[in-house]
Amino acid sequence: MKFVDEVSIFVKAGDGGNGMMSFRREKFIEKGGPNGGDGGDGGSVYLEADENLNTLVDYRYTRRFEAQRGEKGGSNDCTGAKGDDLILPVPVGTTVIDSGTQEIIGDLVRPGQRLLVAQGGWHGLGNTRFKSSTNRAPRQTTPGKPGEARDLKLELKVLADVGLLGLPNAGKSTFIRAVSAAKPKVADYPFTTLVPNLGVVSVGRYKSFVVADIPGLIEGAAEGAGLGIRFLKHLARTRLLLHLVDMAPLDGGDPAGAAETILRELEKFSPALTERERWLVLNKADQLLDEEREERLRAVLERLDWQGPVYVISALEREGTEALCQDIMHYLDERARRIAEEPEYAEALAELDRHIEDEARTRLQALDDQRALRRAGLKSADALEDEDDFDDEDDGDGPEIFYVR
């Protein structure tokens, strides 16, 4: 099934049913009085997290959804039937955003969680409601209120404990195959991974964590180059980042330079994301001699001025992967314990999560705006400003032109 992680839809709640104007008419009862009933409320629109879904592809081609309107009231004080609510299933991890205001309406992070996105219209009143001591035969009713309508943007972020970062062909997919039952495609050419992959890593009998593998980043990714920039948002909810570096690149490149490239692009995309706990993992160590391995390890650490945890592994040979997974599980357990026992630590992590979400959304929205301008044949404000500055410099060199009416 095609992986779609971002869609725009329109939702419309049902209108309320109109009130009824009716009078009681029975044999031997001349003036029965009003008996018009109220209309029914319109149906509302809900989004519900479904753990069996992993993509928003169902909303790629069908984008308009309307709930049922309420029925009008009946005679004999009968109330109209309420419109049926419309429940739209979405994957767990979906963020709902109002397209008009860019306000986050809610996050669906638990299976079965529901979110009201459009409230049904209020019912109209029948003429019975307007009966009084001075108006015994009212001919007044009210129509039902229109249901709420909204343009929504749905963003899916996969829910994973650990996220993998790295250039194409750094061995991220091989790593996830080595430590879990996931089988993403692996090949010796760049951009083999086109969509995020998830793998569940079992540590012992009762413990496990989820790893997310996204397409590799390249130089200029923060400006929209390559595939990985669109999927970096999936790392926003991870608890730990593993920065994989190829120690023996096929093109003979510099591993330290490759690591610096990832850090630069990460900083451009979201400075807050660089503050997430990040471990350095040097992969493909089996392709190097011991002396060369130590030399390249030292070069990477010196170039990055790295102070955090470092692991040298071979995902293909499963060398060093078990110890790495054990340490990851220990870190996640310790992190959960601190969140439960230290309110300040929990609040700091929550604030960091909010910063990452905001920066990722702002960056991706800017890229979308630039893409829309290019398609329309227009230029961004910065480009136009640069052109204006260039023209101002040239104004003094050319002939002075007077426009005469």
UniProtKB/Swiss-Prot annotation:
Residues 129-143 have a biased composition (Polar residues). GO terms for molecular function: GTP binding; GTPase activity; magnesium ion binding. Residues 1-159 form the Obg domain. It comes from Azotobacter vinelandii (strain DJ / ATCC BAA-1303). Belongs to the TRAFAC class OBG-HflX-like GTPase superfamily. OBG GTPase family. GTP binds at residues 166-173, 191-195, 213-216, 283-286, 314-316. Its cofactor is Mg(2+). Residues 127-148, 383-405 are annotated as: Disordered. Residues 160-333 form the OBG-type G domain. Mg(2+) binds at S173, T193. It is found in: Cytoplasm. This is GTPase Obg.
